[in-house]
UniProtKB/Swiss-Prot annotation:
Keywords: Cell membrane, Glycosyltransferase, Membrane, Transferase, Transmembrane, Transmembrane helix. Changing residue 133 to A: No change in activity. Disruption phenotype: Mutants exhibit defective or limited motility. The active site is at residue 201. Involved in the assembly of a N-linked pentasaccharide that decorates the S-layer glycoprotein and flagellins. Catalyzes the addition of the mannose found at position 5 of the pentasaccharide to its own distinct dolichol phosphate carrier. Pathway: Cell surface structure biogenesis; S-layer biogenesis. Its main location: membrane. InterPro entries: DPG_synthase (IPR035518), Glyco_trans_2-like (IPR001173), L-PG_synthase/AglD (IPR022791), Nucleotide-diphossugar_trans (IPR029044). Gene3D superfamilies: Spore Coat Polysaccharide Biosynthesis Protein SpsA, Chain A. This is Glycosyltransferase AglD. Belongs to the glycosyltransferase 2 family. Changing residue 112 to N: Loss of activity. Changing residue 173 to E: Loss of activity. It comes from Haloferax volcanii (strain ATCC 29605 / DSM 3757 / JCM 8879 / NBRC 14742 / NCIMB 2012 / VKM B-1768 / DS2) (Halobacterium volcanii).
Length: 624
């Protein structure tokens, strides 16, 4: 990216400058000269001639705006041209220009002069006088005159309402391009403001209020210029996501301590298990568990251990395609630690731990760590969805689909168990939806890897011409390119795919041995087939990270389909699901503790530092 540079006469000086007015400009060749001249004339009407400067913050224009700005700067020492080769975004351009500004009162307004310039003196003096630290014009206050067409007014009211609701702002209008800040307020807030685009000034105003700065809002006369329509990328993906991001940072995250996170996760787990008692008598389950064969339970644990080196090998292959070569043993330990984190913390917070471990111990960059994890998750979903699909084909060939149709229509009942048809259908729909999305996603990525044109940027560009397109498209492209490195390479796809198949086959075999440990006596072919289906659907059902380790979510899905498709009582099916999950979680915890000791990693520290890393990565992404 080209660095912003200033184009101005060498003779210009900073002496006496009190007010700096920034005009953010992108392809404004038709209007910029008139805007600059009107601005200078208006400032001269209430300020000494040498007390102000006007900065044209030209943001990667591809028309004649740079040449016009250069000429204006050459004609008047009070006019400066601040140039960027690439698009910084409106917020980025403003921030860079304010950094270079000489005045202690920093002002900006839109170059279309939609706000009546007779209000400029009031805007400047509100801050210059020291009465306020920030000031903004408002099109929604009483006594204002704003000819806002419905297509602008409705979205604007909705946006400002959301900002007031979620971010607890006292202002009525955050979007009016007519604002001023004191140098002190700008310097205090600039490092906290993360957005570089259209949300920048909203975030400045919100954070200014939170920090205790005095913010003035006054009515202005405003007349729209040009034709503006709703921009999907800017208004929804951009502005909407930034409201949620700021709300999370200011309101939610300060309340989420490590203790609160653990307690919330445990409560979710207990709640999920408690809800299952509405369908199944716990005493019946405990009775079945008490009859389990200890030797076979131990055998199930040993079998499950085999899947972990396979996970390390798969992760090695993924990282190799991204350009990093590591030993499978170390990577197995990193996976153990991250999966242990997922058992302790909700919302799959343990996933971020792996990126921390490989960065701290092998210096693999955080973006690559997160990308490799995403690749692994996609292949997991693809594999278990494929396994479930294969079993469905087998059921169709043998007439077993009738059993699924029956359970979808009537639910599952027997003994003390009574699961409604609606609940069964919900589980089936969620699992099917996740599976279909995984398969279509991988197919799309594999096909796009062979395409010459930039599909992502072309697709996003259909919805917006705003600078947010660069940010959104860049994030998506980085993620997709890492997936393409594996999915688009036949050899890599085959290696990672076969390893994933082996991992989940071991997972299913573990469940089969657990069922045998509980004395389940059914045809081996049926046992294996139904186990593949129940385990696959159970894991698809726990994709949503609502409880640590998916406890409760996996059990109920496994129970429903095992009881529906095999001659197994619902109580025995639930007991198998609970024991199967317990065995796997026990192996994970033992391996995780051992790996933490061998790699000298604190789990809680890793979770906290990885969360901080994710925040820094978002900041870096916004600054690019």
């Amino acid at each position: 990216m080209g660095r912003p540079t200033e184009r101005r006469p060498a003779a210009a000086t900073a002496a006496g400058v009190e007010v700096s007015v920034v005009l953010p400009a992108y392809n404004e060749a038709r209007t910029i000269e008139n805007t600059v001249r009107v601005t200078v004339e208006t400032l001269e009407s209430f300020l000494p001639a040498d007390a102000f400067e006007v900065i044209v913050a030209e943001d990667g224009c591809d028309d004649e705006t740079p040449e016009i700005a250069d000429r204006l700067a050459a004609e008047d020492d009070r006019i400066r041209h601040y140039h960027s080769d690439d698009r910084l975004g409106r917020g980025g351009a403003l921030e860079r220009a304010f950094e270079a500004a000489r005045g202690d009162t920093l002002v900006y307004f839109d170059t279309d002069l939609a706000t009546d310039m007779r209000h400029l003196e009031e805007l400047v003096e509100r801050v210059r006088s020291g009465e306020y630290d920030a000031a903004t014009g408002s099109r929604w206050m009483p006594d204002r005159v704003a000819d806002r067409p419905r297509k602008r007014g409705v979205p604007s009211r909705a946006y400002n309402g959301l900002v007031r609701l979620f971010l607890r702002s006292d202002l009525r209008d955050h979007q009016c391009g007519f604002k001023a800040f004191s140098r002190e307020a700008f310097e205090a807030l600039r490092d906290d403001v993360e957005d570089n685009h259209w949300f920048w000034d909203t975030e400045m105003l919100v954070r200014a209020q939170r920090a205790g700065f005095r913010v003035a809002e006054f009515p202005v006369d405003w007349e729209p210029k040009g034709d503006t329509k709703v921009d999907l990328v800017r208004d929804i993906l951009g502005m909407g996501s930034q409201i949620l991001r700021t709300w999370w940072q200011l309101t939610v995250r300060p309340r989420i301590t490590r203790r609160v996170t653990i307690v919330a996760g445990l409560l979710l787990t207990v709640l999920a298990l408690a809800l299952m008692t509405l369908y199944i008598d716990p005493s019946e389950v405990i009775s079945v568990l008490g009859d389990a064969d200890p030797a076979l339970v131990a055998a199930a644990a040993v079998i499950y251990v085999v899947s972990w080196p396979l996970r390390g090998i798969r992760y090695r292959e993924i990282l190799r395609e991204l350009g990093y070569r590591e030993k499978a043993g170390f990577l197995t330990g990193a996976i153990f630690i991250s999966q242990t984190g997922n058992l302790v913390f909700p919302a799959r917070a343990g996933d971020a731990v792996r990126a921390y471990v490989v960065k701290a111990r092998r210096n693999i960059p955080y973006p690559s760590g997160f990308a490799s994890l995403a690749v692994e998750r996609v292949f997991d979903l693809l594999t278990i969805a494929g396994l479930a699909g294969v079993v469905l084909v087998g059921l169709a060939a043998t007439g077993g689909l009738d059993d699924i149709a029956t359970v979808l229509a009537t639910g599952v009942s027997g003994g003390s168990v009574d699961v409604s048809a609606d609940d069964v259908r919900t589980a089936a729909y969620v699992a099917t939806g996740v599976g279909v999305v995984a398969i279509l996603g991988v197919l799309g990525i594999a096909l796009s890897a062979r395409a010459d044109r930039n599909v992502v940027r072309a697709f996003v560009g259909r919805f917006s011409s705003d600078s947010y397109v660069e940010l959104v498209a860049g994030v998506i492209e980085q993620f997709v390119s890492d997936l393409q490195a594996v999915a688009g390479n036949r050899a890599a796809f085959g290696r990672v795919g076969l390893t994933s198949l082996a991992i989940w086959t071991v997972d299913v075999v573990t469940a089969v041995v657990v069922l045998l440990a509980l004395g389940v006596d059914i045809d081996p072919v049926v046992l294996v087939g139904v186990s593949f289906f129940a385990v696959s659907v159970g894991n698809l059902a726990k994709v949503l990270p609502l409880s640590p380790g998916g406890v409760g979510l996996y059990e109920i899905a496994f129970t429903v389909f095992m009881a529906a498709l095999a001659p197994v009582t619902p109580a025995a099916a639930l007991a198998a699901a609970v024991l199967d999950h317990a065995v796997k979680n026990a192996v994970t915890i033992v391996g995780g503790v051992g790996s933490m000791l061998s790699l000298n990693v604190s789990l809680t520290t890793a979770v906290e530092e990885s969360a901080e890393v994710r925040d820094r990565e978002h900041e870096l992404a916004d600054s690019k």
